[in-house]
Each structure stands twice: as C-alpha cells, then as structure tokens.
Regions:
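Phosphate-end processing signature that detects enzymes handling 5′-triphosphorylated RNA
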Residues: 1-179
Length: 179
C-alpha cells in the first residue's frame, strides 16, 4: 500500500505541445465494480485476479491498466484533496485477455513522460476515442505542500474537482452510449 499525492491540470491542446518530444506509452484502462476480497483472494466476476494477505479497505475505485503486455490491478481509496491510498498487483496478460471487459467503463490514452524545469516528472495524457482532444497533465508529489514549478501550458487545476478522475470520465462515456 502506498499513498498517492498528485496534482492534475487541464491543458489547452491548441498551443505548443513540448511534451510530444518525450517518450510515451499507449494505455488502456477499464474500471471494475463488484470486486470482492475473500480468504486472501481479490475476486471479480468469479475470477481470482490477485492474492494478498491484507484486505484492501475503503476502496472507491478498482482499475485494470494495460501497457504493452503488462497489466496492473489498482485499488484506490477515497481521494482527500490531492491524496489517496493506492494498492497495486500485477496480473498476467492471459488472465486479463480471458476476462469479459468489452462492456466495462474504459478509456484509452497516450501518456507522455515530460520532465519539468524543477526535475519533477509530468505525465501528460492525450485521450483517444470518445475523449479525443482532451489532454490532462498530472504530477506526483512527495508531500501535499511540495513546491512545483508549473509549466506555462497548464490550464485549470482539476485536483480538487469531482468528475475529472479517469474513472468518472470512463463512466461518462459508458453512460452516453446507453441512449
């Protein structure tokens, strides 16, 4: 278990995009409901996804993230300002591919890793498909009061705003398809 401390910002993509000279990965994320913990097993849809001796508690979001051929199951606790508890487990790609994920809330994005003037790593996500054109940048911090040199291309800060998490965005997409 760890504590994630991050700040998130909208980006106006009509301006220069200096992050595009950086390395990137393509990411697929889907969000699960009904995840259960029983006798050391984290289960969803009758399938054991991971094992852990300690039961994750107060979890608000369960996510599976696919990058290349790696899959990480993440459990996130309730966000309080810029902080949230976070648990992660690697799961085999074969297991992920066997799961019924096509109807789950999901997002696709390209993530660029850009180094700021202060040496902090910014993750700049350019969303795809239904969210094409949306760009969000986030920076992980060691403490909530850590000083950050904000790049000039950042827009509105989203850190404390509800509805801007990737999980919320994925639900918005899923809900819009139910018409």
């Amino acid at each position: 278990m760890g504590v994630e401390i991050e700040r998130r910002f909208l980006i106006d993509g009509r301006e220069e995009k200096p992050w595009r000279t950086s390395d990137f990965v393509d990411i697929f994320q889907c969000y699960l409901s009904g995840v259960r913990y029983h006798d050391g097993e984290i289960m969803w849809n009758g399938v054991t996804l991971a094992r852990d001796e300690i039961a994750p508690t107060n979890i608000t979001t369960w996510r599976m993230r696919v990058v290349d051929n790696g899959v990480v199951l993440t459990a996130k606790g309730k966000r309080v300002g810029a902080m949230a508890e976070e648990f992660e487990w690697d799961i085999p790609i074969e297991l992920f591919n066997s799961l019924p994920t096509s109807d789950l809330p999901s997002i696709k994005k390209r993530r660029y890793n850009w180094n700021g003037a202060d040496g902090l790593l910014w993750e700049v996500d350019e969303f795809e498909d239904s969210l094409a054109g949306l760009i969000i940048a986030e920076v992980e911090l060691d403490s909530v009061d850590q000083s950050v040199d904000l790049p000039p291309w950042l827009g509105m800060e989203l850190t404390n705003l509800r509805g801007w998490s990737n999980a919320s965005l994925s639900m918005m997409i899923k809900d819009s398809r139910l018409d």
